[in-house]
Amino acid sequence: MTASPSKLAQLRELSVVVADTGDYDAIKRLQPVDCTTNPTLVKKALDLPVYADLLERELAWGRAHGGDDRTTTVDEVADRLTIGVGVKLSALVPGRVSTEVDADLAHDTQATIAKARKFVAMYAERGVPKDKILIKIAATWEGIEAARQLQLEGIDCNLTLIFNRAQALACAEANVFLISPFVGRILDYYVAQGQTPASIDEDPGVVFVRTVYNAFKQRGSSTVVMGASFRSTAQIEALAGCDRLTISPDLLEKLDAEHGELPRKLSPGNANNAQITPIDSDSFASGLAADPMATEKLASGIDTFAKDLHALRKTIADKLAG
């Protein structure tokens, strides 16, 4: 008797599966289409033997090129390591690697554009074309405006920390390639408020992603919806059929070990060519202001990403000094 396919195998038939990790061996084993990275994942990756040569090479570069401005040297080594990890991962996945622009720049459109262009150039110097990468940017108004310009230059962007309909619609109106609504962090907020959902269909993170997905498909938007920040396989299963789902290795392993039917929960349905309503900075700001959850989670998400980047830089500074 033939064993039934795992839920992960079934999910691959419904959604593009993305690995939320820089763990080389995990990606090799789980074979996602894409992968996403951030400073914390890069920092963890550098402890793995497979990245030892990269780490030593870039630290040697830092020592050789370090002048009086130590901060600039550390920042440059952090960028080189981030791109180095991405280059290695790009050889493993058939799709794309998301690489995060500094969270410190979340409210600076021009600086975000400059850093994105730098990352694309660094990848190109290492033989990775821009169609193999996504530039990950926090979905502030300034970040979305940066993505609007980058998309016009042919640089595809992943707008992250999406918690609110205004953010999502602004991204679609800007023709952003992909957005990452954060399922788990939305749930976390409401659970902390004593509002634990009675069922997975009432999970506010799941409901939000379903709402955004359906709105985009009904309006004929080409912006990809990639559910992110999952707390359980139940959340993932509830979004089966979403364009893409970025999932941590531990949850991918659980899905790979589970069997039983995995039904499609989302489908394009009768998509039409209706237009996304333009959103300006005032309506964007008012949309966020009316949503305490989104306001809190966007701010705390940027703060967490910034702290993670500073932790990566501190690790590099300590190693350069050692």
UniProtKB/Swiss-Prot annotation:
Single GO BP term: pentose-phosphate shunt
Top-level EC class as recorded in UniProt: transferase
Family matches, as InterPro entries: Aldolase_TIM (IPR013785), TAL/FSA (IPR001585), Transaldolase_1 (IPR004730), Transaldolase_AS (IPR018225)
EC number, UniProt record: 2.2.1.2
Pathway membership, UniProt: Carbohydrate degradation; pentose phosphate pathway; D-glyceraldehyde 3-phosphate and beta-D-fructose 6-phosphate from D-ribose 5-phosphate and D-xylulose 5-phosphate (non-oxidative stage): step 2/3
Reactions mediated catalytically: D-sedoheptulose 7-phosphate + D-glyceraldehyde 3-phosphate = D-erythrose 4-phosphate + beta-D-fructose 6-phosphate
GO molecular function, one term: transaldolase activity
Alphabetical list of CDD domains matching this protein: Transaldolase_TalAB
Keywords of the record: Cytoplasm, Pentose shunt, Schiff base, Transferase
GO cellular component terms given for this protein: cytosol
Alphabetized Gene3D superfamilies for the sequence: Aldolase class I
Catalytic machinery residues: 136 (schiff-base intermediate with substrate)
Cellular compartments annotated: Cytoplasm
HAMAP family: Transaldolase_1
Assembly description: Homodimer.
Role: Transaldolase is important for the balance of metabolites in the pentose-phosphate pathway.
Protein family membership: Belongs to the transaldolase family. Type 1 subfamily.
The name this protein goes by in its record: Transaldolase
Organism: Xanthomonas oryzae pv. oryzae (strain PXO99A)
Classification lineage: Bacteria, Pseudomonadati, Pseudomonadota, Gammaproteobacteria, Lysobacterales
Name of the encoding gene: tal
